[in-house]
Amino acid sequence: MLKSAYDSRQYNHIELANGLRILLVQDPNCVKSACSVTFNTGHFNDDKDCHGISHLLEHMLFLGNNEFTEPNAFNDFIATHGGSINALTGTEYSSYFYEIAAEYEQQALTHLYAMLRKPLFCEALIEKEINAIDAEFLLKQKDDLRRLYQVHKETCNPEHPFSQFSVGNHQTFEPFSPFQLKQKLIRIFEHFYQPHNACLCLISNQKLSVSEESVRLLFNHWQSNYKLPIKPLPVLYLERNLGVQINILPLRKTQRMILTFALPEQQTHYRSKPLNVLSHILGDESEGGLLHFYKIRNWATNLSAGGGLEGSTFKDFNVNLQLTNEGIKYTDEVITAFFSYIQLMMESGIEMWRIEEIAALNQLMWDFPDQAKPIDEAYHYSLAMFEYPSQHLIAGDYLLDKPEVQTTLQMLNYFSPKNMRIKVVNPFVKTTHKAKWYDTPYSVAPIESNRLKYFLNGNWRSRFTLPQANKFLPSHRPQKAVEPQFTLPKKILSEDGLDMWYGQDDKFHQPKGDCFLTFDCQAVNEGIYVTTAKRLWVALLNEKLNQKYYQANLAGMHFHFYPHQGGFSLQTNGFSANQLNFCTNLLTEIIVNKDFSSNFSQVKSRQYQGLSNALLNKPINRIFSKLSVLMQQQNHAPSELANVMQNLTLDDIAATREKLLSQFHLEGLIFGDWAAEDAYKISADIKEFRMMFGTCDKIHRGVADIRHNKIISYQVECLHKDPAVVIYFQAPDASLKNIALTILAEQLLAAPFFNQLRTEQQLGYLVGSGYIPYNQHPGIGFYIQSPHHPAEYLIKAIHLFLQQIIENINQYRHLWDTLKKGVMKQLMEKDTNLSMKSQRLWMAIGNQDKTFTYSMQMTQTILDIDFSEITNYLIALVSRQGFGEAILYSPGQHASISYKTEVITDIQSFKSSSQYL
C-alpha cells in the first residue's frame, strides 16, 4: 500500500470471506479509537412510493437491536466513555462512524456489530422517529442551500433517483402504517446492509494483529444472504435540462450565479485529476485571472471553481460567483468573459509544468498534512475503499503520477454554452414555479440560440493571462534541532506593551509552524462605532492581501486577520521555510495599506449583507448569538453592527485605523520548526514595529454578572416559525473546582436530557445541552427548537427535567467513575496535529496559564470530586443558590411567555446597568 515516506502509521487492508473489506490503521499516538462503516446504498435506493425511507433506516438502526434492546444504547455507551457518534445517508452511500476511549474499543465494536446485524425496527419507535425526521425537515425549510438543492432536483431528469426527496417527512411516510414501514425497512436492510456491500475502517493504537483479531472475531459471523440488486442509473440530465437558465429567489440577501457543466464520472481519472488542474487555473485569484478581471469591473467579489454534485455515473463542474449589484446587470458579459478565458486555455494548452506544480503541491499536502481527527479519517477511508484500489487507499486523493495533458484539454470540450446550466440566485428575479417541499420560487427556461452564440463571441481574451509559476512553493530544508528548554513556550521578550513567546515542537516533526500576534487596542472601549469600523477595516485589509498572497495560500503558507473583542489578531501558519518573513511583511502591510477606495463599496456591501442575513439564521443559532451579546461586555448584536455599518465612510475607516494603532498592547507566540535565533530575530523586528505606536494595558473582557438577579428573560426576533428556547445557568465563580463541577454536570445530564426530551417526548430535532464558558467563567446551557410546542412549554419541560434529575440522582451513581474518566481523558487528549497544539498553547497564554499545566490541574480536581459534590452542585443549580439564570427564547408563531422573570427589553440598557466579572 502506497503511503507517504513521512507517515509513521501502519496499515493493513483485508477482506473477509463474507466480502467485507476492512482497513486497519495502527496509530500509536491516538488516545481514542475510531471506526466507520460505509454501505454502498443511499437514498438512490429509496422506494419510489416512499421517499426518505433510507434516512428513516439510518435513524432506526440506533433504536435497539436483538443484543442491546434499549433505544440509543450505542449512543449512550459512546457518550459515557468519552466519545462521539454520527451517521450520514447520502445519495449512493450511508456511513456510521464513532470515536471512543481506546480501552473500550472492543465493546464499541460489539455494539456496532449488533446494530448492523439484527435491528429491531420497533413499530412504536418508527412513529416517534418520523416525528424527529419531520422536525429535521422543518428545521431546514428556511435553509437556502436546501431550497436551492430542491430546485436542482426538479430541473434534472425526473427518472433519475437524484430527483427524489431524500429527507422524508410526515407526508411521505403518512400513507403507510408502522407495520408497512417496518417491512420496507427490513427489505432495504436485508438487500443492502450486507458485508459484501460494506467497507469498514478501524483506527487504533493497538497492533494491527490485535485489531485484525478483534474484527475477525465479530464480523466473520456476518453472513451475506442476498445478491445485490443491480439498478442501472439513467442520465442525470436530459437534453432539455441543459442549455437552460434557472432563476431562484432566495430568502437571504445574496446575489449568486452558478454555471454548471455536465461531465461524465471522474473516478477513472484519479491518477491524472484533470478537473483538479482546471479548477486550479480557473480559480486563480492573481492578476490576469478571472476573479481579478471581475473585481476590476465591479462584477463579482468571489469565485470558486470545481465543486458540484458527483456520483458513480456523473459529475457536475460548478463555477460559483458572488455577484455585485453591478454584476447582476451584466450577467451575460460575466458569462462571455468566462468563455473567453476557456478559449485562452484551449489555445494556450496545458503546459506540463502546471501539472507538475499541482503534483508538487499535492505531495507537500500528503507528506505534511494537518492530521485530521481519527473519526474523520475513519469515515474518509471507509468511503475511499469504494473509490480506489487497495494500493492507493491512502494516496488516492493526492496522487497525480499519471498526468494526461490531452485528457485535461478534452475536458474543456464539455465547457460549452449548450452543456451549461445557469443558475441566477438573487432577490430580484422573476419566477413562475414553486419547488415542492421547500416552496422555493424559481423559473426555468431554455437559453435562446442568439445568447448561446453571444457567449462565445466575447473579445475579452486579451485581458487574461494564465497563472504564473508559484514563487511561494517551499524549498526543502532540514528541520531545526529541538532545544529541550523550548519544548514548552517561554517568554523571550517582555517590555511595556509587548510580550513575545517562543517554543519548539518535539512531537510532530514537520517543517511547519504557527505565528500568533494579538493587538489589544484601547480604542475598542469607545463602543460599537469603533467595533464596527474595525470589522470593516479588517475585511478591507483581508481583501487586498488575499489577492496579493493568493499563491502563498496555495503553497501551504496561510494568514488570517480577524477582529476580536479586544482588538484584532494576525495569525500565520503552514510551512516554516519563509513564514517568518511572510509574517513581518504582513505587519508592514498593516502600516502601508491606507487607501481602500478601490473595493470599499464591494466589501462594505458584503459585510452589511452578512450582518443583515443573521436575522434569517435558525432560531437556536440566533438565540445563542444573542446570549453571547448579552453576557459579554465587548460583544454587539449583528443587527446593531449592521445599522452602524451602512453609514460608514472611507474617512471613518481611516480615523478608526489611526485610533486602533495609536495605543495597543501586542502579545505573540512563535511555535514550530524554528530555531531560537529565528525567534529572537523576528521578535526584534516586531519590537521595532511596536515602538512606532503608543502602548496600553490589555483590554478586560467583561462578563455580565447575573448571579444575584432574578431569572432574566429576553425575546429574540427571528424570521422562522419554530419556537426555540435556551436556558443558561451562570456558575457561582470561575474557580477550578466550579469549572470542573460545571463540566461534569453537563456531561452527566447530556444523555438523559437528549433521550427524555428528544427521543421519548419528541419535543424537536434540535435538543441538547452544552458547557458554555464566557471568557473563562463557566456555565451550562440547555436548548430546544420545536416545530410543535410553544416556548413556554419547552421552558417548563427543561425545568421539570432538572427537578426530576435531582429526585432520581442516585440512578446515575453507577456511571460516575466512568463519566469522570471520560472527561479526564478528553482533558488530557493528545493534539492531533501541530496547528492544534499551537492553538492550545496560544489559548493557554491568553488564559494566563503561563505554566501550561491547566489540564493537569483540572484533571486532578475532577479526580477529587465525589458524587455527593455533584449532587449538591445540581441541587444548588436548580434552586439557584449562587447561580444566575437567563431564559432566551423565540416564540415563533406562538405568544410570548408569561413566566415570572425580569424581562429585558433593551440589551444596551441591560449592559450599561450590569456589573461585570
Give, region by region, the residue ranges found by the protein language model.
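M16/MPP (pitrilysin/insulinase) zinc-metallopeptidase core fold and M16-derived inactive scaffolds
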Residues: N29, A34-E99, D144, Q164-N169, ...
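A conserved hydrophobic secondary-structure block that centers on an alpha-helix together
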Residues: F179-P195
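Buried hydrophobic packing residues in well-ordered domains
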Residues: G19, V37, H55, Y96, ...
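C-terminal regions of mature proteins
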Residues: C201-S204, E357-D506, I623-T695, I699-R707, ...
